């Protein structure tokens, strides 16, 4: 019985570490995204960072610019 509970808990922890955005329903600030604006949370847009490691390859949810 204890081994089943441990297994379920381990699977949940792995899934929550691998797919944190899927549990939240939308992707939060600085989460990786796939160029679709609607997958990021309200007020965020998906764009390529122009700095840092992997720039131009990995897209992230960032704050929408005002103006």
UniProtKB/Swiss-Prot annotation:
The keyword Disulfide bond applies. Residues 1-24 form the signal peptide. The keyword Transmembrane does not apply. One of its GO terms (molecular function) is acetylcholine receptor inhibitor activity. It is found in: Secreted; Nematocyst. The modification Lysine amide is found at residue 66. It comes from the Eukaryota. Coiled coil: none annotated. GO terms for cellular component: extracellular region; host cell postsynaptic membrane; nematocyst. Keywords: Acetylcholine receptor inhibiting toxin, Amidation, Disulfide bond, Knottin, Nematocyst, Neurotoxin, Postsynaptic neurotoxin, Secreted, Signal, Toxin. Disulfide bonds join 26-41, 33-46, 40-61. Alpha-toxins act on postsynaptic membranes, they bind to the nicotinic acetylcholine receptors (nAChR) and thus inhibit them. This toxin shows inhibition against mouse alpha-1-beta-1-delta-epsilon (CHRNA1-CHRNB1-CHRND-CHRNE) (IC(50)=1215 nM), rat alpha-3-beta-4/CHRNA3-CHRNB4 (IC(50)=5.173 uM), rat alpha-7/CHRNA7 (IC(50)=4.786 uM), human alpha-7/CHRNA7 (IC(50)=8.869 uM), and rat alpha-9-alpha-10/CHRNA9-CHRNA10 (IC(50)=202 nM). Also competes with alpha-bungarotoxin for binding to orthosteric sites on muscle-type T.carlifornicus (IC(50)=256 nM) and human alpha-7/CHRNA7 nAChRs (IC(50)=19.81 uM). Negative results: does not show activity on rat alpha-2-beta-2/CHRNA2-CHRNB2, rat alpha-2-beta-4/CHRNA2-CHRNB4, rat alpha-3-beta-2/CHRNA3-CHRNB2, rat alpha-4-beta-2/CHRNA4-CHRNB2, rat alpha-4-beta-4/CHRNA4-CHRNB4 and rat alpha-6/alpha-3-beta-4 (CHRNA6/CHRNA3-CHRNB4). Does not show activity on rat TRPV1, human TRPV3, rat TRPA1 channels, the human ghrelin receptor, human neurotensin receptor 1, rat ASIC1a and ASIC3 channels. The presence of a 'disulfide through disulfide knot' structurally defines this protein as a knottin. This is Alpha-actitoxin-Ms11a-3.
């Amino acid at each position: 019985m204890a081994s089943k509970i441990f297994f379920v808990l381990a699977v949940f922890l792995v899934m929550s570490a691998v797919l944190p955005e899927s549990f939240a329903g939308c992707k939060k600030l600085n989460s990786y995204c796939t160029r679709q604006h609607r997958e990021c949370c309200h007020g965020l847009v998906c764009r390529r960072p122009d700095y840092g490691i992997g720039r131009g390859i990995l897209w992230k949810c960032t704050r929408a610019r005002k103006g």
